[in-house]
Regions:
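Non-catalytic, conformational "gating/processing" segments within enzyme and secreted inhibitor domains
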Residues: 30-44, 85, 123-289, 309-392
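Short beta-strands and strand-coil junctions in structured, solvent-facing domains, enriched
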Residues: 292-293, 417
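Acidic/histidine-rich, surface-exposed loop or edge segments in extracytoplasmic proteins
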Residues: 49-60, 93-97, 111-116, 172-181, ...
């Protein structure tokens, strides 16, 4: 049996860097980072056996979704706090894949705190399953200029003088489908060019450069990179763009896009609409009921996502978006339980016999959203030291994002929050 799925472009790249603790001779780097139907067979989605369905459900449930959502909300709010009066976007999925690879090389208390943050004791097994599932989101067929793509790639770049543990290498290859290459980090220019070329290729040009030569120190020994790339057009017709500007908030004016939404959500704190991409993922625009400043935590995002959506007609309005965010995540991650990975007590002995600890974790994101689709990119860098009855007439709902709002780009099928953000201005 064949099933139709309706398919903006999102790119996520996570880059993790390792450097030997002081006193070690090995060497990492400081990374800055119409309506087309896709036909998917039931056989491809699952093999039509009860066992396969159970496996899928078990794997989806293997990640504590409450933990994942709470972490995403908390991190987005922390980034917004240090970027007051600016739009922000954070990619939890990008960070999770970077931390997931680190967890494969961690031991003791370091492994425990990473597992707690990731909401699972075996992120690698989940990563392998998820990377296999998302290949069904891909199609070369274009919809208003956008192909449908959701791809993850991983790589480990080790200095020639650093010996990786066999078990770690095997897990990166088997579970993350990662490639492992050796570099001479003393040749900073060539090392950067090699890593940046990989990132440019795997993010289809959205992230052309991740690191610069001054990011690499004499202690640099390892760089782990993850890229997540998503591209798709909107399902159904494009949004209509207004010809004149209207107010956004109290002080700005902008042109809006209008459309019918696919789902409507409401709780005590917010109203929201979902608009599908062709591949079945969705954009969720969330409007606080109070008109003052807000945090995502205020809006009870988990409760909103778990509430039963209404399928009555919903009219939605929002501005086009084009902005980027850069953030250093060390203090934010330490505040929610990951201080161990930055300390001298960090245990990454599963990566190498040389002592290592995380020095800095950075993330840079970019979002471009218009009437035809969406493009978004994120780079996460962890720099380490080598330490149906008849329906009643529909009620028309409205969600007009004409003042500061929150948003998600969401994998409805597997319950993964790829991006979360807060919009406070249209002038960027």
């Amino acid at each position: 049996m064949m099933k139709k799925q309706k398919l903006t472009a999102i790119t996520v790249a996570a880059v993790t860097a390792l450097t030997p603790i002081a006193g070690s001779s090995t060497v990492y780097a400081k990374l800055m980072p119409s309506d087309t139907d896709i036909i998917v067979s039931d056989e491809e989605e699952n093999t039509d056996t009860g066992e396969d369905v159970d496996v899928d459900e078990a794997m989806k449930d293997s990640i504590d979704k409450t933990t994942a959502i709470n972490n995403a909300v908390s991190m987005t709010d922390k980034i917004a706090k240090v970027n007051k009066d600016k739009n922000v976007m954070f990619s939890p999925e990008s960070l999770n894949f970077a931390l997931g690879m680190l967890a494969e090389g961690a031991d003791g208390e370091t492994k425990k705190v990473l597992q707690k943050y990731l909401g699972t004791e075996n992120f690698a097994e989940y990563a392998k399953w998820y990377m296999d599932k998302i290949k069904y989101y891909n199609s070369e067929e274009e919809n208003y200029g956008y192909k449908s793509k959701l791809k993850i790639a991983d790589a480990v770049w080790a200095d020639n003088n650093l010996t990786l543990q066999d078990k770690f290498k095997q897990s990166i290859q088997d579970n993350f489908n990662g490639e492992i290459q050796n570099l001479d980090f003393s040749d900073k220019e060539n090392s950067c060019n090699t890593i940046n070329a990989w990132c440019d290729k795997n993010t289809e040009g959205l992230i052309p450069e991740i690191i610069t030569p001054d990011a690499i120190s004499e202690n640099t020994g390892l760089c782990l990179t993850n890229s997540l790339y998503f591209e798709s057009g909107w399902s159904g017709d494009p949004w209509e763009v207004s010809k004149k500007k209207e107010k956004f908030g109290e002080k700005e004016e902008t042109k809006y896009m209008t459309s019918k939404g696919d789902r409507y959500y409401e709780n005590d704190k917010a109203t929201a609409f979902a608009r599908y991409y062709v591949n079945g993922l969705s954009f969720i625009g969330i409007l606080p009921k109070d008109e003052g400043d807000f945090t995502l935590e205020d809006l009870d995002i988990e409760g909103l996502l778990k509430s039963e959506p209404e399928y009555d007609e919903v009219q939605c309005k929002m501005p086009k978006l084009n902005f980027e965010t850069s953030a250093t995540l060390n203090d934010m991650l330490s505040d929610i339980g990951l201080e161990n990975i930055f300390s001298d007590k960090a245990d990454f002995s599963g990566i190498s016999e040389q002592n290592t600890k995380v020095d800095t974790i950075l993330q840079k994101t970019k979002l471009e959203l218009d009437q035809n689709g969406t493009k978004a990119a994120a780079v996460t860098a962890a720099i380490m030291e080598c330490m149906s009855a008849l329906a009643p007439d529909p009620v028309v709902k409205e969600v007009n994002l004409d003042r500061p709002f929150a948003f998600l780009i969401y994998d409805d099928i597997n319950g993964e929050m790829l991006f979360a953000g807060k919009v406070v201005t249209t002038t960027e």
